[in-house]
């Protein structure tokens, strides 16, 4: 996290999408994007920026709140108000760089994600304290009837049980099979 920004991750995602589209064996009408946690935030932004190139979006515990909370110098409930002074924030032993914070000030992930017009699958645990379930609830509001939303009761961010992981995987697999092959 020290040398990364959400904007940089989005740029990487766009480059990956371009690469996938350049492959001869890829059916360009059947490209889906999947993301977990901050990767879910990034995936939703890539889909919003490239709506014509993405046919479906799958998100597990998306974490756009990381961006919004950084504007208040908070990261997953941890005060990181010393980030400008130190040049980084210490979050659970990980250095989060000043660039991450500065980048977050100019981003609005939900506004970018709202440009995506296709179907979406959301899976979130109701005991997630890393990325609040409110993030997926907000995405559901944005995407409306185009979004399926599975709440896995008792699951936290890492889905630390076989049953939780199976529910998450089954939901995404059924959705992607339907959207890509149906």
Question: Which residues does each PLM region occupy?
Answer:
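Catalytic histidine neighborhood in serine/cysteine hydrolases
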Residues: 140-158
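Hydrolase active-site cap/lid region
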Residues: 49-99
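Glycine-rich nucleophile elbow surrounding the catalytic serine of serine-hydrolase chemistry
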Residues: 35-45
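Catalytic histidine-centered segment of alpha/beta-hydrolase-like enzymes
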Residues: 155-168
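Short beta-strand/loop motif that positions the catalytic acidic residue
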Residues: 116-117, 122-124, 128
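Conserved alpha/beta-hydrolase "acid-adjacent" motif
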Residues: 129-135
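Alpha/beta-hydrolase fold nucleophile elbow
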Residues: 25-36
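Alpha/beta-hydrolase active-site loop
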Residues: 3-23
